[in-house]
Amino acid sequence: MTIVSFILFLAFAGALTWFIVRKQDVGSNTGFFLAGRSLTYPLIAASLLLTNLSTEQMVGLNGSAFRQGLCVMAWEVVAVVSLVAMAWFFLPKFLKSGVTTVPEYLELRYGKSTGTIANAIFLFFYVFLLLPLILYTGAVALKQILDFNTLLPGLSDTAILWIAIWLIGLMGCAYSLFGGLRTCAVLDTINGIGLLIGGFMIVFFALSKVSAVNGGELSLMQSLSEVKNAHADMFNTFGRPKSEVPFGTLFTGVLIINMFYWCTNQQIIQRTFGAKGLAEGQKGVLLCGLLKLLGPLYLVLPGMIAFYFACKGLLDLDMNSSALAYGKLVTFVLPNWLAGFFGAVLIGAVLSSFNGALNSSCTLFSIGFYKGLINPQAEDRKVVRSGRIFGFIIAVLCMCGAPLLANTSSIFDYLQKTNGIYNIPLFAIIVVGMLTKFVPKMAANVALFVGVVLIAFLTFGDPELVQKVTGGMNIYHVDTVVFLILVAIMGVWSFVAPRKEAFVQQDAKAVDMTPWKFSWVAGGLLLVLVALIYASFANVSALKDNETEPVPHHWHMIATEIANKEMTALEIDETEQGVIITEIKASIDEFDKSDKKPADTAVTRKIVYQTIGKHYAKAKGISDAHLEAFNKLVEREAAKSAKEADDIKAATEPAIRKFFKAVIEGIEESAETVKKDAEKAADDAKKEGESALDSINNGVEGVSNSVGQALGGAVDSVSQGIQGTLDGVSNTFKDL
């Protein structure tokens, strides 16, 4: 049923798109690259939204929300401010010039060399960063949603990944290279409707599941209140000073990055260049802004609900696997018969992003290099043909290179690190070019070079040297400093050696430049809504929390869940339980404040068991020697679980459980024997390459038999008495 609903939705979207655009002209530059400048505001809004939205947003932003809470909505909500700026200031400038690309505008403003350099920068990062990343993340999502491992048994994960990448890539090529911008825009609109339905559908089923696990009597709003009450500090728009997006960065680097992306990024704003007129473009941009305000509901809230379920032990997630949060939530709450539809919607979003980037790459090459440098007199048919050939070549290269991203430690880190290298310098010269009249092309060229080199050094340079240079400043503040340096360079240059004649922008008469009469009112209302959203969930006190890591309370809650199970099974009295919980939280905080990495799964597990073991050993009179042996074993296994594969981790857990059982019951001789033999069984299993879990279980079983022979019925009695404790420990290790 999943694969059937997937195919049906894609077929419906493709057929409807063909029916709508079947008579369009794609033989001319304007027809192919700008949809004949005929796009209306619904198409522009949907195309902007879908070109932006792909699996790196759906998966990455929800994963960040799982770790950080509501504060990560900044990437969605601050985008609205940028879209208002686009409608009010940037779009009139671009449309008045009649340009097809951003580098073409820079060529008009500064000169041919500046436009060519900008063209090369855009193309380089689209081909080597954006397109492969879209293909890879989309393929991973497609593989999981459609369960390709079951559909294609016998194939390796690598082979399945290649198949998924080429499937998405070839579909994207068909839409982008043969249909042009209008085909992409129509498909984006259809997928956009499906995405909104699918995104809100996930929220509906997730909140319904919250109600189900609480007795099934809660309404949707009551379910949302349950999540909020359980984790109130996650519902804070301001975040903490050490959050991924501290509140202060909303006015510095986060704003600048959003302004570049929504106001000057060719992949995005090419849709607005195809508008019928300025009014249609402004309405489309502002409608997109309104839709972006809904983004946190399906890009942030699901991640927070996933955290709620994880803390309840219903989802196998921790802070190190937050990238899996959205996928696991979808699998957990969505009925099977809807999985195919949602998969098709998600892949539609991927196709929209891929189509947008590929179409923009073709446009940049055809207009900037082929017609601009190689064949200036080329007729439209040849220009379009050159774009299609170039697009096909880079699509094949990207489909071949995308699987290599599987070896990247974090694709989201890869994206964030490389994006700033080109977007800050480009945004600086565009803004200065629009606001000034005398900055010469040499100043812009130097600023581009200095900006790329400087940010590349700050991103990939020696960490100690970068730390000294920046003084530990937040990376988004650093981006702002670089931006201001580049603006200063161009400002000083224009004062010392200005261009001979002031730049005067000419009206190319390409479209009707009559503005939408309600653009200022609509934009103002959007800005008010942004302020209200932030104010509604603001917690100013969190801004003063300088000592705490972004979300140590998450580890507090997870640790408390584990500890409560074990202490209840061990019949520790409530007063002592409170003391132990307080000590566990203090130990986690102390670890976070140290020079080591923040607390993670292994650290939390280790702290919980060592703390309980210490208190229980004292109460039961267990010797210090055996308690020390237990602590060492916990240390060793915690370290191993953080480094080794899951099967080795699972295999070594019975050794801890068996030894923990023996120690807490005071069977000192058997504990020592179990410890040694279980360790030996684990080592042997690892060396021989056998199934580690079976080997250790067999080893532990053999040890238990020998201990039973030595101690008689005593061990059997003890084992039966604490079987519930063992089950709790086992489930905790697996769940965490």
What feature does the model see in each segment?
Residues I572, I580-I584, I588-T601, F630, ...:
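Extended non-catalytic scaffold regions that mediate assembly and binding
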Residues I580, I584, V608, I612, ...:
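Composition-driven recognition of long, low-complexity, acid-poor segments enriched in small hydrophobic
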